[in-house]
Amino acid sequence: MSDLDKWVLHGDEMRRPLLVNPKLGESSKLVIVGGGLSGLCCAYRIAKKRPDVEVIIHEQSSLLGGVISTWKEDDWICDVAVNASRPHPAFWRLINDLELGEILKPSKSDAKSRWILLDGKQHKLSWRTLFKIGPMKLLRSIKKARMGELSVAQVIPNKQIADAMCLGIVNETSENVDADFLFPSLTKFGQNPPVKKSKLNKLISKSYPIFTPKKGTIASLEGGMQTLVDTLSEQISNLDNVTVFYGNSADSPSAIATTYDVPLESVIWAAPNPDIDQDSSKISIFAIGYTEQQVSHIKKGYGTLIPDVEFPISGILHESDVHASQRCSKGHRLFRLMVPHNRWDNDLNSVQECAESLLATNPIIFKKIGERQIPHYKPGHMSKLSQISLDCSYVGWSYSGVSITHVIDQSERIAELF
């Protein structure tokens, strides 16, 4: 496969380090530690491509799927973790191969607007946002960022806007987030494509199965993202060369290699690295719903980011505005609230009071639907990945990032080695 072909398949994911032992592709038997989305995708891609390779999934819990889950109550539907995918052909290819194309829907055309709450006022993100940041300051910061290992705060010279962007993606403020990790194309991290960006984008656009997404849209699955991991789990269970073992912890890659009698290079570690001290933050997710009349004053859009630490809520996502598939009954609207634990006193009332002040009083439903733990990606994260000893291979959220496209594309790149 040519370098250009790889870039058409994977796009800017090619900039991210692939933490794979060079002998992995020679394995006749391999063990994947972790049955979350990353582990499931790796197992599916490798097992389908190489029916002669024995694939074992070692999952410490009693269920596959990891952090991906969808909350449902009556007609209300809300994803607890990832709720959609940005345009990337790897996600489209997986959905197509799983025969889920009929339930993959682009986001609604009237829900593109995004806002940031700045000094108590909603600011719509647009080209005008550049003037709040300062175009010349931004240009100088971007040039400086190409030296590597800078924080997002050092690249985006407006703390509130930089914090909002980071909180919306990794639940952390901008001084603690690696700019190379969040904007590898902007900082020119890693290798560059062999053709101009405009030409590459045209080639990538032509490669989508199912439908070609429009610029600025996202896509989601009818019924929520749990459908994806449920379908992966079901299809993997029907593959003769895949076995899943549940309920046992995994102390280290070497211990797993001994347990399953495989060489260390045949272990894929799809879990946090036990040898790396990677901090994390916790966030609670709430669903809140109203009649359309109650929130008629709330403009339709994608959502609002809130960098101000005086608010327990860091983001409000307009779930029913964005998704083309039903998220609530007709005549209602559903919102998802993101509540970082370092901004919250653990009192449910404080979240509801804040939400009501920002949306409307007397919601029809208000419920905490889950908690999640998000790894930190501190400045220098991407550079440090290249220093990891690759006695085995590493995949997943802890390395690539929290976007669903990262881990799905990562599994394709690994399967190419077989």
Q: Residue ranges of each PLM-predicted region?
A:
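Conserved flavin/dinucleotide-binding core of flavoenzymes
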Residues: S2-L24, E319, S325-F418
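Glycine-rich active-site loop/strand segments that organize a redox cofactor
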Residues: K6-W7, G66-F91, M136, S141-I142, ...
